[in-house]
Amino acid sequence: MLRRPAPALARAVRLLLAGLLYGGGVWAARVNKHKPWLEPTYHGIVTENDNTVLLDPPLIALDKDSPLRFAGEICGFKIHGQNVPFDAVVVDKSTGEGIIRSKEKLDCELQKDYTFTIQAYDCGKGPDGTGVKKSHKATVHIQVNDVNEYAPVFKEKSYKAAVVEGKQHGSILRVEAVDADCSPQFSQICSYEILTPDVPFTVDKDGYIKNTEKLNYGKEHQYKLTVTAYDCGKKRATEDVLVKISVKPTCSPGWQGWSSRIEYEPGTGALAVFPSIHLETCDEPVASVQATVELETSHIGKGCDRDTYSEKSLHRLCGAAAGTSELLPSPSSSFNWTVGLPTDNGHDSDQVFEFNGTQAVRIPDGVVTLDPKEPFTISVWMRHGPFGRKKETILCSSDKTDMNRHHYSLYVHGCRLIFLLRQDPSEEKKYRPAEFHWKLNQVCDEDWHHFVLNVEVPSVTLYVDGVSHEPFSVTEDYPLHPTKIETQLVVGACWQGGDLHMTQFFRGNLAGLTVRSGKLADKKVIDCLYTCKEGLDLQVPEDGNRGVQIQTSSSQAVLTLEGENVGELDKAMQHISYLNSRQFPTPGIRRLKITSTVKCFNEAACIEVPPVEGYVMVLQPEEPKISLSGVHHFARAASEFESPEGVSLFPELKIISTITREVEPEADGAEDPTVQESLVSEEIVHDLDTCEVTVEGEELNAEQESLEVDVARLQQKGIEVNHSDLGVVFTGVETMASYEEVLHLLRYRNWHTRSLLDRKFKLICSELNGRYLSNEFKVEVNVIHTANPVEHANHMAAQPQFVHPEHRSFVDLSGHNLASPHPFAVVPSTATVVIVVCVSFLVFMIILGVFRIRAAHQRTMRDQDTGKENEMDWDDSALTITVNPMETYEDQHSSEEEEEEEEEEESEDGEEEEDITSAESESSEEEEGGPGDGQNTTRQQQLEWDYSTLSY
């Protein structure tokens, strides 16, 4: 009975122990269940001279394990971040309260705020600190509050200013102080104060000083002010500043340091026109200045200085294709249809033609060959005014007879430019564009303008001064009906073929009128033709042009400069230069004008700068002297003239150009009145544009003579040639060496030289369309008619009566240089002349000897037979002489020509006097005999012809 309760007790004990064990485990597991908790963000403020940070919200870490000991307590805070000068301290473990404090002295001027993260951790499960749990990371922003520890400091040690008397200045100068504190409250300067009493000046909160009354230079020349500054924390500057304000007498604003006359010497490059100019603003505060410099060149040439070559040459220089026909060329032997037109009467600048409403020029047939179906270009310089509403024709192609149809025409109507182009007859009879209208101020503003029409049916493009313009109106018309009537091209009016009179006369000035068929004018060519050779230039050094805006007009005649800094603007103005790139510019005045606009901070008191007017005097360039030299007189055999090569007219031609300069005396003799300036001639190089070879005397006969040149060589040189009955004209802008080479190639041919004794030619070269002319270089070529000397001697031996013709032929050559047998020799040397004369004289003596022997023989025969031929009163009775009447006439004619030639040669060629004299002496010996040959003299007296006894 007692044993039964034992198992039940044991079971209860086991259950109790198990319950105790189970309950204790649950309690232990619930000791540190939760992590500490912090606010996500904290904002703090700390003063730079304190170390405690005031946080919002306060730093308190919460733990749900509270109030358990250890697990519910906060043991510390941990700060995360690099170089964070703060640490966090737990004030109360049970409440989790803590503080953040700085570890070192903070400086707001170095760093104004800090940002870092912080974590809280509890005490763990027990005193050993195991099982510690950490909160999430919270962000902390801390701002360092400034302390007014720095006083204001002025930027400058002293200030200076100058003002003009008698003005109320809105601001004379500004004093400025700074504060090193970091906060806006203590770093800003809130006020300035003038400490000097009884002065007529005030200073505002921004530091601007102005006068309270008008200053008087006579009363006070200079004021000295002491000025201090306060920051917004009322802290005064430790050091006050001294301000000196000078009073200046009344000032006149404007440009100073410029000269009204600037002399420009040609060929010197760019010339600074305002090297010492500066703008006097009379110390007015200037916000900006705009200065416009204008060069007035409208009175020079066609608006400015340009090359004055012929328009055809200018087109070639600008790269235009060949085929340009010039309708208003300078008058010459080859282009003479503009002779009657009034011109500018000078060659210093472009040659222009004036039309007064009653004049017109008929263009010869063949000058222009135009196919309206193909592209073509019309180019012209025009100056025209508002002369009313009548049509005024520039260029017109119309029917020559029977009808008044206009085929194409360029005319003005008021301020409109109109181009008419009627299509040629075609199978399609439908309307086509025929009349193109442009309304432009340039047509009637009385200034020179350059007009270029690019015609490519059905469109026409107009360029005025290089700017393209589309027609505002295009009128259509039917093509012309077919006829066989020729057309007449006229400049300055339009020919009415049906009425046989001119109409629609032009009033104005024209120049450079050209027509070119084929390829249209390129824009680069058009710009090149319009570009001026003179203008204003501004080359600013690398360290300059700071803050200065520069604008240049397309014509280089207007420069506009704008800048805020007057000093920098002055530097830019001092670098403005005048440049004329022509070797021989047009002399005269180019007016200069400066207009200025000044903007001030206080526009009510802004200054006005009066305009400046001056001029550039382009001096007369040293006039070049173009000299042509070479052989003036030579003779050639007739066979050379008749050969295919002909005779070179200018084989040794030399072309040089020189200028004469005045050389000032050296410094030692500059003050000596007896020392005079010396003239020095120096050779220069420039181009030529024309060389004209004309024949003197009768015009060239194309049936028997010509002037020829290798055209292929000319094209390589870029030179054109025009032939006429008067000679040839070479045109094209090329070097003197090129023209020299071309003239060496010019040859004269004559394939009927029997009646030709000589031919004379004249050569003149020019530069700049006749502005500079060379000397007249004259050449005389003689034709030598010769026979075979051996055959002639035999003939004379057999026929003594021909001695006199041979003698005459020899005399014909006296006074001339005998031709060298070498085809390239120009003038035979003296030795050659002597040899030829000696050989001729020897032949003559042989013939004379034969004649005398025969005469002696005849005299012996006569003595033997004295009864025969008693009627003859001379010894050579047996001699029968037959005289050719034609030879007698030729002898007389030749003798007259011989005397004239000898007289001309004695006056023209003094260097040939020796040859002439020797030839005359030989001739006289033949006619009269020498002083030592008395027998010959007697014989000559005996040989007196009795024409009555001669039988023909």
From Swiss-Prot:
Protein's name in the database: Calsyntenin-1
Region (Disordered): 886-952
Organism, scientific name: Rattus norvegicus (Rat)
PANTHER family in UniProt: CALSYNTENIN (PTHR14139), CALSYNTENIN-1 (PTHR14139:SF4)
Alphabetical GO biological process terms: homophilic cell adhesion via plasma membrane adhesion molecules; neurotransmitter receptor transport to postsynaptic membrane; positive regulation of synapse assembly; positive regulation of synaptic transmission; regulation of cell growth; regulation of synapse maturation; vesicle-mediated transport in synapse
SUPFAM superfamilies: Cadherin-like, Concanavalin A-like lectins/glucanases
One annotated Gene Ontology cellular component of this protein: postsynaptic density
Summary of the function given for this chain in its UniProt record: Postsynaptic adhesion molecule that binds to presynaptic neurexins to mediate both excitatory and inhibitory synapse formation. Promotes synapse development by acting as a cell adhesion molecule at the postsynaptic membrane, which associates with neurexin-alpha at the presynaptic membrane. Also functions as a cargo in axonal anterograde transport by acting as a molecular adapter that promotes KLC1 association with vesicles.
Biased composition (Polar residues): 934-952
